[in-house]
Amino acid sequence: SVITGAVSAVIGFFSFRLRGIYFGVGTIAFAYVIYIIAQNWVELTHGPMGIPLVPPLRLLPESVGVVGRDVQTRIAVVSTIAIIIFGLDRLLHSPIGRAWHAVRENESLASSLGISPLHYQMAAFVLGAVISGLGGGFYAHYVGFISPTELGFHYIGVVFIMLIAGGAGTLPGPIIGSVVFGVLPELLRVAETARNLLLGLILLFCIAVVPEGLTGIWNRLRPERKAASDRPSVATVPGVAAEIVSPATQTGELKLGGVFKRFEGLTALSDVTLNVQPGEVVGLIGPNGAGKTTLFNIITGMLAPTGGDVFYCNREIGGLRPYSIAALGVTRTYQITSLFPELSTQDNIRVATHLRSCRSVLAALLRNKRFRDSEAAIDQTVDRILQLVRLQSRCDLPASALSYGDQRRLEIGLALATGAGLILLDEPAAGLNAEETDELCDLIRRLRAAGFTIIVIEHDMRMVMGLCDRIVVLSLGRIIFDGTPTAAAAHPDVIEAYLGTETADA
């Protein structure tokens, strides 16, 4: 298991540079290389002849003959499986498991919330390899023989079928898949010639009809949990108001000095210099293509600047990874809503509390006091944020089932849950009606009063003028104005950028 884990770490180091289907192809290619090496390294593996006479597993000395060797092996296997399932269940119901789910659903969003995708992908990859290596060791002792053919594509395909048919991304899925596809071949022996065809048809059925696997059928048929709307919402109880949250990280000045960003021959940002003080609400406006979202991407680490400096709290953040910048107290929302669609509303927010949580593997397994206190505090934070963004009555709904306006509010809830002191909102009022926009403005004012620093990209000029302390205007990648909303409304360069030269002259 240790050797398997070490080898998987090396393979993962190279494979995780790939994305999507290329990652799968890359890992299969590595498996095939190992298979070829095992087939041809005769001195170590005996080649196709394999290694015979592997001694059976013994838990008790030979002098104790009460329990046979086969029974001892079965006891060891069952006990190990039980321990692994218990441990995995605890990990999956902890910040570690939430991070795995987040990276699987929306890697870029997870990164902006302070979760390192590569760290958690590698951890899952190595853990899976260690468990597989342990299973291979038990198999060798039970059968008494090791052959390189066990590494062939046939066995890789069987494991893949078990995973897909059972349900990927769940703990019961692979267990159900392994049981079903361990029993099915025996049941189908009566149709020996058509057995592989029938197994293939079952797999195609799962992919086409129930892509989430056999566990998905259970999830569809089981009684739905009681809807959150049937429970009393604290936000709707008379005399109880949603308590504003405060930044969990220190807040400080954001300084941009001479920032440039070039994409091959295109200059998206040119000599952008900007200072944002703690507790300010700054509106970043400009025509489409002015470079507003590009500037957000640079501040939050989605893009590295071509030149210039970006400092937050007197620390250089330009070029850092998004999760590193989030850990320093900077997060954002997106122009196009970005959530974890399959997770419930409250679980979306719970994922976003990652930086506040106890992320120790040992604590997650033991459920010690530190872990329990951390999870209790997170539950309270989630409840407060649900009240604050007025989504408590929809807390059990998946994010994909929320209305567009609710999804926008949930995005802000995710940003608040990180504990960041600087929040960048990219067109938060897009698609909202006038009443929802007013509610959003009220929320932003309350956040400013609580100590948050907020930069808003917005095209709703009524909202910007009534909400922001300062207005910064970008045009063609340059700042053409930085001042009060009143001065911005009368500035000729701002009018020209929005309305055109002829209208400005008129």
Regions found by a protein language model. Give the residues of each.
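Residues at structural and domain junctions
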Residues: S1, G65, R69, F86, ...
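Transmembrane alpha-helices and adjacent helix-loop boundaries
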Residues: S1-V234
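Intrinsic-disorder/low-complexity coil detector
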Residues: G47, I51-P55, L60, R222, ...
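Compositionally biased, intrinsically disordered low-complexity regions
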Residues: M49-P52, I202, T215, R231-T236, ...
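Intrinsically disordered, low-complexity segments enriched in proline/serine/threonine
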Residues: V54-R58, G97, G213, V240, ...
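Alpha-helix initiation/capping motif
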Residues: G68, Q72, A76, D89, ...
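ABC-family P-loop ATPase nucleotide-binding domain
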Residues: I217-F260, T503-A506
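Glycine-rich phosphate-binding loops of nucleotide-dependent enzymes
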Residues: T249-K255, F260-A506
